Amino acid sequence: MPYVRYDKFREYFNRHNKETNELGKGKNNMNALKTNAVLQNGKYCIEGVLGQGGFGITYLASQVALNRKVTIKEFFMKELCNRDEQTSQVSVPSMGSVDTVARFRAKFVKEAQTIAALNNPHIIHIHDIFEENGTAYYVMDYLSGGSLSDLVLRDGVLAEATALGYIRQVADALSYIHARNINHLDIKPSNVLIDGNGNAVVIDFGLSKRYDETGSQTS
């Protein structure tokens, strides 16, 4: 594992201890799919909204056949997209925004493909990706522990041993992707979730960049 300035990581996490994690707050969900909406011909059933950002809505859902909880992220640019309440179809009302939305949707799909190719216990796992309702979705593990940001807001300053454990796990994830010429570029407490075993898991590769062997950016 590369040398890590643990004091700098801890300072960074503490500096962000008031940041609100988008997951679990259920805000800004006026354009979200309704509870009990189904996707992929009933394969997935929406249970509720976990959060919404500028580029997507995150849902808690059930994978019906396997009887398990999953997280589904839907591409939805809330400033540029509309949803038909009856059909759930997503549209772009302004013709001038169509190309912009298409470009960012392609990036959303690329993000999912990037994560799906990774295999590290401290990086979120993606199980499925599909298009429906005029937009794109990908399906991830559901992690019930909330984010590192949530943890600090709830419990206050972490014990040193706990903080160092999370830092080492995040560093392991970063070392893994750096070895594959990927930079995450958006590591912060709200992008580190805690799984059911108390381990840190890195999410949200929306700003990530991939480089070739010469150091030139490829995505």
Where are these regions (language model features)?
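Protein kinase glycine-rich loop
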Residues: 47-53, 58
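Conserved N-lobe loop of protein kinases adjacent to the ATP-binding glycine-rich P-loop
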Residues: 62-69, 76-80
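AlphaC helix of the eukaryotic protein kinase fold
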Residues: 84-117
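Activation-segment/catalytic-loop signature of the eukaryotic protein kinase fold
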Residues: 129
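Conserved short submotifs of the Hanks-type protein kinase catalytic core
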Residues: 133-147, 151
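Activation segment signature within eukaryotic-like protein kinase domains
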Residues: 166-167
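Protein kinase catalytic-loop region centered on the HRD/HxD motif
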Residues: 172-182
